[in-house]
Amino acid sequence: MTIMRKTHPLMKLVNHAFIDLPTPSNISGWWNFGSLLGLCLMIQIASGLFLAMHYTPDTLTAFSSVTHICRDVNYGWLIRYIHANGASLFFICLYLHIGRGIYYGSYFYVETWNIGIILLFLTMATAFMGYVLPWGQMSFWGATVITNLLSAIPYIGTDLVEWIWGGFSVDKATLNRFFAFHFILPFIIAAVAMVHLLFLHETGSNNPLGIPSDCDKIPFHPYYTIKDFLGIVLLLTFFFTLVLFFPDLLGDPDNYSPANPLNTPPHIKPEWYFLFAYAILRSIPNKLGGVIALVMSILILALLPHIQTAKQRSLMFRPISQLLFWLLVSDVLVLTWIGGQPVEPPFIIIGQIASILYFAIILILMPIAGIIENKMLKW
């Protein structure tokens, strides 16, 4: 008698993806973040669905409806904080997942990597539109500033911005369409994530050594299901500590004031997970140049497979590249800090140096380090 999971059309799909999947025997905890991102997406879709039942996308009542959720709906405050902090958790896992991909050379699975970049853009768009929905001060002004960047596009810029706004400023039409897009995009993200997995399972997982592991594979279940489960328990422990004890730690106090088009906040800034890109945008005095740098700060990831000069895939045995990788991580943290500071000395020059360093490490220093390391292999 054949096992049902190997014959049933639906079970067979699950079996090939999560049960009998041949997996390298030496992948570390850094490979847990894929499953954790899946968990984050499920948390966001579930909590978002319940919030959408009580939220009204109208400029007059949006702020009040969020207040109503927190005060009058059973456990509404909990659902709201799970959703708000779930976005932060999503981006923490996302950045760690990308960092692992860069460190261990996973970007050589080009299709999987490029779909991952598309997923990053979709997630950033979803998070941005979600931040607008509570219609607080930072929601309104964040939406105004970020959508206004599109006006830097030559010739069609102004028309494009007014088309997105649905008028001559951020108003009811903007809020309404942002809610519609914010609702549908997570489902698109889930579908694209399936394609991401499909391409990954075509090649199999990478491993810390960056070498083919066909000779030493083990089944995904039970070895990695139990490992993923441990990751999930640790993640949820951290997450609920954040939600229940420090729910406003990562938020902006300005968003507790209703949106007022006549009163500009002293310092407009996005959520913490966009601050590194925001700092790069602000460090260039030209508007169009800033927008190009902003987009390139993410798109540059797509160049990684094409600019590697080292003969080894992983950074595990490449000390110079390791040093540059951790310099890049530090640089992104500096950019995140600068993005949250006002535009005044010495923050301006620090931001400009950090922005130049960000692109220089990836485009210039990493390839040079690869060439030096190739020569070191011959000694």
UniProtKB/Swiss-Prot annotation:
Heme b b566 binds at H97, H196. GO terms for molecular function: metal ion binding; ubiquinol-cytochrome-c reductase activity. Heme b b562 binds at H83, H182. The chain crosses the membrane at residues 33-53, 77-98, 113-133, 178-198, 226-246, 288-308, 320-340, 347-367. It is found in: Mitochondrion inner membrane. Its main location: mitochondrion. GO terms for biological process: mitochondrial electron transport, ubiquinol to cytochrome c. GO terms for cellular component: mitochondrial inner membrane; respiratory chain complex III. Binds 2 heme b groups non-covalently. Keywords: Electron transport, Heme, Iron, Membrane, Metal-binding, Mitochondrion, Mitochondrion inner membrane, Respiratory chain, Transmembrane, Transmembrane helix, Transport, Ubiquinone. It is a multi-pass membrane protein. Heme 1 (or BL or b562) is low-potential and absorbs at about 562 nm, and heme 2 (or BH or b566) is high-potential and absorbs at about 566 nm. This is Cytochrome b. It comes from Dipodomys microps (Chisel-toothed kangaroo rat).
